[in-house]
Amino acid sequence: GVPCLCDSDGPNVRGNTLSGILWLAGCPSGWHNCKAHGPTIGWCCKQ
């Protein structure tokens, strides 16, 4: 999957670890949405 920035990673992409994975159809079982606002397409999820 494509890495994405969780809320817990920091305010922006630069210099932060992207600990989430972008899912287009929602988070799979056992994962949770880790970003409160956005991304515009899909969900940023982590285990």
From Swiss-Prot:
Residues annotated as transmembrane: none
InterPro entries (UniProt xref): Anenome_toxin, Myo_ane_neurotoxin_sf
Tissue: Expressed in ectodermal glands. Not expressed in nematocytes.
One family name in Pfam for this protein: Toxin_4
GO cellular component, one term: extracellular region
GO biological process, any: regulation of signal transduction
Principal localisation: secreted
Subcellular location: Secreted
Cysteine pairs bridged by disulfides in the record: C4-C44, C6-C34, C27-C45
Keywords in alphabetical order: Cardiotoxin, Disulfide bond, Ion channel impairing toxin, Neurotoxin, Secreted, Toxin, Voltage-gated sodium channel impairing toxin
Molecular function in Gene Ontology: sodium channel regulator activity; toxin activity
Family: Belongs to the sea anemone sodium channel inhibitory toxin family. Type I subfamily.
Annotated function: Modifies current passing through the fast sodium channel (Nav) in neuroblastoma cells, leading to delayed and incomplete inactivation. Produces a positive inotropic effect in mammalian heart muscle. Paralyzes the shore crab (C.maenas) by tetanic contractions after intramuscular injection.
Protein name: Delta-actitoxin-Ael1d
Protein species of origin: Anthopleura elegantissima (Green aggregating anemone)
